[in-house]
């Protein structure tokens, strides 16, 4: 975050974190996406230093039939069951200590990851079509508002052919 402001301060609501040897400052965007339609139904913004498992309750709306997630969500099965009682949990299994995982589990994780890849499509449209690169505002609330409006437009963009077909019929 820039310090080119009157206070010469970084945004106090955003924090820094490290991934490998690289340091990042800012916020993280977590989205919930319908696995069939690919449309984003929820978006949560957290500071960069918050673990990915914490916004799970805000990402689930309760009517899910299946929940997909990476191995960071593997320890959150109870939380997922409490928030979405009718949903089957399809989170990836973690590898054992030493990194060994049998081929059957690896094949299941690969199949789950193919479905999970649909979560990345709204991010691609947000970045490539709408040109989202950096945050514009100080504070998480303003940036969340901008991102929610952007994801509403992303959903319209993703279903534009269907909408045009119904409008001309």
Set out the residue ranges of the language-model regions:
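Polybasic low-complexity intrinsically disordered regions
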Residues: 1-88, 92, 148-154, 162
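Short, charged/polar low-complexity linear motifs in solvent-exposed/disordered segments
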Residues: 58-61, 142-144, 168
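A short, flexible helix-boundary coil/loop motif
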Residues: 163-169
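Helix-centered, glycine/charged polyanion-binding patches within enzymatic domains
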Residues: 65-66, 71-145
């Amino acid at each position: 975050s820039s310090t080119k402001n009157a206070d010469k301060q970084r945004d106090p609501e955003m924090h820094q974190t490290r991934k490998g040897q690289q340091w990042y400052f800012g916020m993280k965007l977590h989205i919930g996406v319908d696995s069939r339609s690919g449309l984003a139904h929820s978006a949560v913004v957290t500071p960069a230093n918050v673990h990915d498992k914490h916004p799970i309750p805000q990402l689930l709306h309760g009517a899910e039939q299946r929940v997909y997630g990476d191995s960071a969500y593997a320890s959150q099965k109870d939380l997922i069951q409490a928030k979405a009682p009718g949903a089957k949990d399809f989170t990836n299994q973690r590898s054992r200590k030493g990194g060994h995982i049998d081929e059957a589990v690896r094949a299941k994780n690969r199949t789950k990851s193919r479905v999970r890849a649909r979560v990345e499509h709204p991010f691609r449209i947000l970045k490539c079509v709408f040109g989202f690169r950096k945050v514009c505002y100080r504070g998480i609330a303003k940036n969340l508002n901008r991102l929610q409006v952007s994801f509403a437009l992303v959903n319209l963009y993703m279903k534009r052919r269907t909408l045009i077909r119904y409008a001309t019929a």
